[in-house]
UniProtKB/Swiss-Prot annotation:
<dbReference type="InterPro" id="IPR012612">
    <property type="entry name" value="SASP_SspN"/>
</dbReference>
<dbReference type="GO" id="GO:0030435">
    <property type="term" value="P:sporulation resulting in formation of a cellular spore"/>
</dbReference>
<dbReference type="Pfam" id="PF08177">
    <property type="entry name" value="SspN"/>
</dbReference>
<comment type="similarity">
    <text>Belongs to the SspN family.</text>
</comment>
<dbReference type="GO" id="GO:0042601">
    <property type="term" value="C:endospore-forming forespore"/>
</dbReference>
<dbReference type="GO" id="GO:0030436">
    <property type="term" value="P:asexual sporulation"/>
</dbReference>
<protein>
    <recommendedName>
        <fullName>Small, acid-soluble spore protein N</fullName>
    </recommendedName>
</protein>
<keyword id="KW-0749">Sporulation</keyword>
<feature type="region of interest" description="Disordered">
    <location>
        <begin position="1"/>
        <end position="44"/>
    </location>
</feature>
Amino acid sequence: MGNPKKNSKDFVPNHIGTQSKKAGGNKGKQMQDTTGKQPIVDNG
């Protein structure tokens, strides 16, 4: 937590976890993204 650079390995898995959360909250983001920006990832 204090030394993210030292825990480079921990940083990678951390990112995956963050992405998972983003995917779950994509529903809410999709509505906001509908303003005129629809990412292809959302389509998939």
